[in-house]
């Protein structure tokens, strides 16, 4: 049976939804090992629920964008004999696997939404208008996988208590091979109880129509356990951080539910959210392009509509 190496650059006390999806996908492709920059003890504790046989970690804590992670990845792949390597399609995951592909002279497919037992990957392209199938010749085969591509039922059925994996510590050079990159300072983002935008199963997004006031959307997001997104117009206006931008030049999301409020739906914005399973659009302009792709549309002022949604959700929870 083939060996699948899952790259989790840094593990917290528990795994994220995107990491669990990646592990669930890997279990259907072969025996699973994990390569991580987290300490061996913490990694083994966090992965006791997954069918992971071995965890490869460095002799010191590593986290992106430390280029030594690529040294760890390379050594872990060689040590495990993995013929498939998976990472989440985040900037850090894609960067690490792209560098690894160069070192190993291997093929890489990025932003896949599914991988079958034969190694064929499906990709959603051209803002979700088409699905393509691609395959890598030779081994190892490297893939990054878009968050929210593996459904919740598959994750729950594939993962369960499986015992503590074996830990293997690999030596990593103090300085990555000729990287020229030095991490001088780390500044954590302001903490939030909301899920990460690219991993969230529900996203509430606002645009020019919020006119600088995201509070009404934050109330809705709180009721739904959702992440907050925004159009480029909203981030350029300084109403919300650019990290919340959804679109061609921002974050690409594929949630189960995407609520668009006060966003016209220009093609650049649609490119970042069109693959959502269900799209709800709220806009005063009945001719707004967003209604062309919406599953449900509400023509109205978001400041009238959204509070009614919040109230209905609260009543439903209390009943």
Q: Where is each model-derived feature located?
A:
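N-terminal glycine-rich FAD/FM-binding segment characteristic of electron-transfer flavoproteins
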Residues: 1-319
């Amino acid at each position: 049976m083939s060996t699948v190496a899952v790259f989790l650059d840094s593990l917290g006390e528990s795994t994220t939804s995107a990491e669990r999806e990646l592990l669930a996908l890997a279990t259907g492709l072969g025996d699973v090992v994990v390569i991580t920059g987290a300490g061996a003890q913490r990694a083994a504790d966090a992965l006791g629920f997954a069918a992971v046989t071995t965890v490869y970690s460095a002799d010191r804590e590593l986290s992106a964008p430390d280029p030594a992670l690529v040294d760890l990845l390379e050594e872990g792949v060689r040590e495990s004999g993995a013929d498939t390597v998976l990472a989440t399609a985040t900037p850090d995951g894609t960067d690490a696997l792209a560098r690894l592909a160069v070192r190993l002279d291997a093929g890489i497919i990025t932003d896949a939404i599914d991988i079958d037992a034969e190694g064929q990957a499906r990709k959603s392209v051209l803002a979700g208008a088409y699905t393509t199938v691609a395959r890598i010749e030779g081994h190892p085969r490297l893939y990054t996988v878009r968050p929210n591509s593996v459904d919740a039922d598959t994750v729950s059925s594939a993962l369960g208590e499986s015992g503590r994996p074996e830990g293997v510590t690999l030596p990593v050079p103090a300085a990555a091979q000729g990287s020229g990159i030095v991490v001088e300072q780390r500044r954590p983002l302001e903490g939030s109880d909301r899920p990460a935008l690219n991993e969230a199963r529900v996203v509430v997004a606002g645009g020019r129509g919020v006119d600088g006031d995201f509070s009404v959307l934050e109330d809705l997001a709180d009721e739904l356990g959702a992440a907050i997104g925004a159009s480029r117009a909203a981030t350029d206006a300084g109403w919300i951080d650019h990290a919340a931008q959804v679109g061609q030049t921002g974050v690409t999301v594929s949630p189960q539910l995407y609520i668009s409020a006060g966003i016209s739906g220009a093609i650049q914005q649609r490119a970042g959210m069109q693959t959502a399973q269900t799209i709800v659009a709220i806009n005063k302009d009945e001719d707004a392009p967003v209604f062309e792709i919406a599953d449900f549309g509400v023509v109205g002022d978001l400041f009238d509509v959204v509070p009614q949604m919040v109230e209905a959700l609260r009543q439903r929870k209390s009943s």
